[in-house]
A protein has these predicted regions:
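Bacterial Sec-dependent signal peptides at the C-terminal "C-region" and cleavage site
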Residues: 8-21
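Short beta-alpha connecting loops at secondary-structure transitions
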Residues: 90, 407-411, 468-479, 530-533, ...
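Active-site acid/base region of carbohydrate-active enzymes
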Residues: 136, 140-144, 292, 302-336, ...
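Solenoid-like repeat scaffolds
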Residues: 563-570, 600-604
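Alpha-helical repeat scaffolds
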Residues: 557-564, 596
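Generic helix N-cap/helix-start motif at coil->alpha-helix transitions
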Residues: 538-543, 570-576
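Non-catalytic C-terminal accessory modules of carbohydrate-active enzymes
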Residues: 153-171, 590-735
């Protein structure tokens, strides 16, 4: 219900904004370099009010980011979203300014950052711009607004950020702060005009601002005779550095970076500050991430650092779920997985918050699964945004590709695109949210994309290269079977959504294709494992796991497949999620946990990094970043297949509870869209106890593990054929 309220509060992403903004104008500064890379512009507008209205809803669109102060009070910290609900459109924000206003004279100041560069999550319009309108205030941006070009904002010295990032490394020269001349703004167009295009209301919350925190630090000297002040942070976070410094002179260059200055193999975001004489405070507004903040300056500089601090910001949701168990390694993993998930959420889902900040859909399918089980329903809006962006960027020929939004990436990764529309992507979103409207929105795009896929002469999914034939990091990837498995799951999702959206006439063809794929896949069974005849590498654990997950492999093959999994470990942390899920589903949960601890153990126990890795070690394949949330997939496996909680009816109106006590004791709370669900079980010798909370308006089907002769619920004999209504239940089971 809460998610329905959230979505109702947002305008539909595929619809134009029917706005009253006809008198508002896009504006920018009168300066020849206003559209260049890393341009900063300040706007100012005075406003006289006879009285403060009860509501002052204000529409703001900016290319690319903005900070808003009203009467000297911060109203928005980093507003705006990276551009691209579709290739030609932009986002706008809505904020109520009434709490910041007063009777009489008011002043609004907006600091605008124009990226001026395409990135892996941003489509550059080519022009800086701001448009503001409030019907409640009679406010509209136009040439009466003052603006100034800000020469104090510059690019930092090398190394510059890698090509994937649209953001620049900021350099702020305080010696020339405020030197730009105030002028009347230049009017550039109306609401909806090019190059910014159609404006779509922001579908996700504003960032959570945790405020500024000062930190203690240590001091060292590096090889270049620079003083390095290092401050350990509580965890990997999105932060903007804050310094308080006195310089006897002026012109000292103070560098600011984190321990994630290189996201594995590539340079990421850092910043510089040039001092003026005297005492000064500065916050560098371009966010970076890491567990350690470093302030670096020449050893011979006559400066005093009074304090180092940071402002943490993050996605506007809460960690309302919880989990503890009797296995401390899994508890440690859970904490790192949640931290990794959160730092990979902002304008979009990310693969990593340092190197790329890109919405790769293989990652998204795993990140959203974790989010549904542990984050408050507000987080579902980021999945909603990701899904609509993916289909709205579909090419005319039907191709889907990611990451999008993007201006510097155009390649299809066929395996990831099938995953995106599969039962782990679009359909999984529907199961957890109940958002049928989005399924109706996306089905035509799914159908067009699936039409690009064909079968070969054997009835198996034909190879589709796309722009990059990527199935996983690592080696020994049986791509023909991997594509076939994802194709099968995408067809399953399409059939489900076709039935939901009154397109049932499409279902027989989807089922025909699935039957053909399953038969051809099983022809690749050699008696002990699956291999495609054209594949000459070591047998791939990924495709054997996918055979189980799809249901293509029947139970008669499970014992042989178990022996296969004991001998093969080729999957990266990305595809390992599906291997572990397959093991649990085939009754080998204990081995799945052993394999999980063996493979993930080093990153779980790593004392430096509070997040999970892209590869099996720091600096491994794929660039080797140390904050890749695809490594958190086991969180979903535990919630769904060990705690045994999954929706039976979309939106958790009905759900099942099938605990699998391969972990002797687990206690999980899920903040579903229907309310909080708690399941806590403990097995001890011949007894098993389960405590369950069923939210109001929902029903639960409970299946107790086999082997118990007496099952009592709240002191009465349990009838497993009956669904449980809302309430609290205690199951006591004995053998």
């Amino acid at each position: 219900m809460l998610f329905a309220v959230i979505i109702a509060a947002f305008s539909a992403m595929c619809a134009s904004c029917e706005s009253p903004e006809s008198d508002a104008r896009w504006i920018s500064v009168d300066h020849p370099e206003c559209d260049e890379y890393n341009t900063w512009i300040e706007f100012s507008k005075d406003l006289e009010l006879d009285k403060v209205p009860g509501s002052a809803l204000t529409h703001i669109a900016a290319d690319s980011k903005y900070w808003l102060w009203v009467n000297g009070r911060m109203a928005v910290f980093e507003g705006g979203l990276k551009r691209g609900p579709d290739p030609l459109s932009s986002y706008y924000d809505v904020i109520d300014l009434a709490p910041y206003l007063k009777t009489g004279e008011n002043n609004m100041k907006i600091l605008l950052w124009h990226f001026g560069k395409d990135g892996f999550s941003h489509k550059d319009s080519g022009k800086s711009g701001l448009i503001v309108k409030s019907k409640d205030l009679g406010l509209a941006s136009d040439s009466s607004w003052l603006s100034r070009y800000m020469p104090e904002y510059q690019e930092a010295t090398d190394p510059e950020p890698n090509y994937r990032l649209s953001e620049a490394n900021l350099r702020y020269d305080s010696r020339i702060a405020g030197k730009g001349e105030w002028k009347a703004s230049v009017e550039l167009g109306k609401w909806g005009d090019e190059p910014w295009g159609r404006l779509v209301e922001r579908p996700i919350p504003f960032w959570k601002d945790y405020g500024i925190t000062n930190v203690s630090f240590t001091q060292d000297l590096d090889d270049a005779s620079n003083i390095v002040l290092s401050a350990r942070l509580p965890y990997n976070m999105h932060l903007t550095p804050v310094i308080d410094v006195t310089d006897v002179n002026e012109g000292t260059c103070i560098k600011m970076e984190t321990n994630h200055i290189k996201g594995g193999s590539e340079y990421c975001i850092r910043a510089e500050y040039i001092t003026s004489a005297g005492r000064q405070q500065y916050e560098s507004l371009g966010w970076m991430n890491g567990e350690e903040l470093r302030i670096i300056y020449p050893a011979d500089a006559e400066i005093t650092i009074h304090s180092i601090g940071y402002r943490e910001t993050g996605f506007g949701c809460e960690r309302e779920g919880s989990f503890t168990c009797s296995d401390e390694t899994i508890n440690m993993f859970w904490e790192k997985a949640m931290r990794t998930l959160y730092v990979n959420m902002r304008d979009t889902y990310f693969d990593c918050p340092d190197r790329e900040r890109a919405q790769w859909w293989g990652d998204v399918t795993i990140l959203t699964g974790q989010s549904y089980y542990q984050l408050s329903p507000e987080a579902n809006s980021l999945a909603y945004k990701a899904i609509h962006e993916l289909v709205n960027w579909q090419r005319e020929d039907g191709t889907l590709y990611s990451p999008v939004p993007a201006g510097s990436w155009h390649n299809e990764l066929p395996a990831q695109m099938l995953a995106s529309i599969s039962t782990y992507g679009f359909w999984y979103y529907y199961l957890h949210t109940g958002d049928a409207e989005t399924m109706a929105d996306v089905y035509p795009a799914m159908k067009r994309y699936l039409a690009l896929w064909t079968l070969d002469e054997d009835g198996l999914t034909a190879f589709r290269k796309g722009g990059w034939s990527w199935g996983d990091w690592g080696y020994d990837i049986d791509m023909r079977l991997l594509l076939a498995a994802w194709h099968y799951l995408a067809l399953e999702s399409a059939a489900n959504i076709a039935e939901l959206t009154d397109e049932a006439a499409d279902i027989p063809e989807y089922r025909r294709l699935q039957d053909s794929i399953a038969k051809a896949y099983n022809k690749c069974w050699n008696g002990k494992e699956y291999r495609h005849p054209s594949y000459d590498g070591a047998t791939d654990d990924r495709v054997n796991a996918m055979a189980i997950i799809t249901g293509i492999a029947d139970t008669s093959k499970y014992d042989a497949l178990f022996e296969h999994f004991k001998e093969h470990e080729h999957a990266s942390p990305y595809m390992e999620k599906y291997v572990l899920e397959a093991l649990v589903k085939t009754g080998h949960g204990a081995y799945a946990l052993d394999r999980f601890k063996k493979r993930f153990g080093p990153m779980i126990s790593d004392p430096v990094y509070t997040t999970l890795f892209e590869s099996w070690e720091v600096g491994g394949y794929g660039g080797g970043s140390t904050n890749h949330a695809w490594s958190g997939g086991m969180l979903t496996v535990i919630a769904e297949n060990i705690c045994g909680l999954r929706p039976l009816v979309p939106g958790w109106k009905e759900f099942e509870v099938c605990p699998n006590p391969v972990i002797p004791e687990c206690d999980i709370t899920i903040p579903s869209v229907a309310g909080k669900i708690r399941s806590a079980f403990k097995t001890d010798g011949d007894s098993f106890v389960l405590n369950l909370t069923v939210p109001k308006g929902t029903k639960a089907s409970v299946r107790i593990p086999d082997g118990y002769s007496e099952i009592l619920v709240n002191g009465k004999t349990f009838d497993s054929s009956k669904k449980l209504k809302s309430g609290s239940y205690e199951f006591r089971c004995t053998k």
